[in-house]
Amino acid sequence: MLGVGAGVVAVLVALVMFMGKEPSELLYSNLDLKEASEVTQALDQAGIKYETKGDGSTIMVPRDKVASARLMVAGKGLVSSGSIGYEIFDTNNALGQTDFVQQLNRQRALQGELERTIKAMQGVNSVRVHLVLPKRQLFEEDAEQPSAAVTIGVGSREPSSDMVRAIQNLVSSSVPNMKAEKVAVIDQHGKTLSAPSDESLAGKMAQDRKSEVEARIAKTVKDMIEGVLGPGKARVNVTAELDLNRVTTQEERFDPDGQVIRSESTTEASSQENKNDDNAGVTAAANVPGGQGANGFQQLGSRTGQNDAVTNYEISKSVTTTVQEPGTIKKIAVAVAIDGVSAPMAADGKPGAYTPRTAQEIQQIEELVKTAVGFDAERGDQVRVTNIKFPQPEDQGLEEQGLLAGFDKNDIMRAAELGVLAVVALLILLFAVRPFIKNLSAPAPGQIALAGPSGGPPVTRLVTLADGTQQQVVVDQSGEPIALAGPPVSDIDQRIDIAKIEGQVKASSIKRVSEFVEKHPDESVAILRNWLHEST
């Protein structure tokens, strides 16, 4: 009993000391040892208690001091995320430096700035950036392209493809003439996260697009069915076949009935020609000066004219360019499982009767699903709705989930501490306080406690012993003795050893007990049995 009590007290003291300790929270992690030393010195000067974990790179401070400690450390510039940025040019003197040193400092500064930017992303714990910047040569025809390698630490989870592409685009946009595919992204386990080629990147994007379409359609169908049947009454699975080809179509159409005069032009031409007739004879008129035929020839004349009209018509023409982006649904298959109707649980705890859905209800739900997904039988779409009995969740599990909802890790730990404290207090009551109270309510040292077969308020009666003396005995209502009065305290009793048992008893008490056993054997056996039962 003493050992159990001491153990309970020790546990209680340890628990009180643990609960009395101020809760701590993370200040910085994964620090460089030099920076960790500077931060701890600053915390000592500010009088802020701290605790280091791991190899010294993790610093914990009291929860109510986290904000002030971070502001103090940031104000002193003690933590630079382990990377050197453009501040390297603030301390170095450019005079006397060679071109190689200047280029190296420029590369280090660019790498440090990229590391800081990438580390600011959510989920990134550590990062290293290595840039390969080829030196430009005069009169070069094929310039070597720059490249980069980025190593990120993201813990136990795998970064998404969007994060990897964002890192590639960030690094390639920060370095002149660098392409995104020239940036290799690797995690802390040595796994390559960046796509090695455009084809694999396109395949990954296609798979993401397919998963996105299937999830969107499944959510739409499930929300619609659960809005009709109730929450948790539907399970939906969608398989979509997408056309991932990007098609550009250009079409020209001419309308002959829509012709319009564009331009008109008219050309008029005329000419006149006179000539002598050599076949005409000699006449008197030809010999008269100034008369007709004075030249001796007869003149013949001709006149020609030409009119040209040109009309240009513009025919109506329409040009249509159609671009079909990848992701068009070619075929879709939807599988829906719906639950039946379950009656409320009976008073004796038995589940209620289950009633499956009727064929008419299943047909109505199938029509709703076809309308929601844009069902097209010509392209081979399939929709199947089946009634299946769902397993009912346990009420206890739901209650536990509801109780834990809304509590963070600190609240759960605090509740666990209070629970342990309550258990320790209960153990103290059972093993320390209860025996103490029991001892207080026990008979006086001068009495021997006896147990009777029946209960009730005790009474006292005189019992004649073998030597003729009378002894007071405490009995219950049925007359069974439950206590034997001891001798007066003022008597001087002789003490003897019994079978070398450690401790001593009064000789007169032993004599009286022996006489009582001889006179009342049945009651004595009952008393011994009760003692044995209490000892076990």
UniProtKB/Swiss-Prot annotation:
It is a multi-pass membrane protein. This is Flagellar M-ring protein. The chain crosses the membrane at residues 1-21, 417-437. Pfam families: YscJ_FliF, YscJ_FliF_C. Belongs to the FliF family. PANTHER family: FLAGELLAR M-RING PROTEIN. Residues 262-273 have a biased composition (Polar residues). One of its GO terms (biological process) is bacterial-type flagellum-dependent cell motility. One of its GO terms (molecular function) is cytoskeletal motor activity. Keywords: Bacterial flagellum, Cell inner membrane, Cell membrane, Membrane, Transmembrane, Transmembrane helix. Residues 247-300 are annotated as: Disordered. The M ring may be actively involved in energy transduction. GO terms for cellular component: bacterial-type flagellum basal body, MS ring; plasma membrane. The basal body constitutes a major portion of the flagellar organelle and consists of five rings (E,L,P,S, and M) mounted on a central rod. The M ring is integral to the inner membrane of the cell and may be connected to the flagellar rod via the S ring. The S (supramembrane ring) lies just distal to the M ring. The L and P rings lie in the outer membrane and the periplasmic space, respectively. It is found in: Cell inner membrane; Bacterial flagellum basal body.
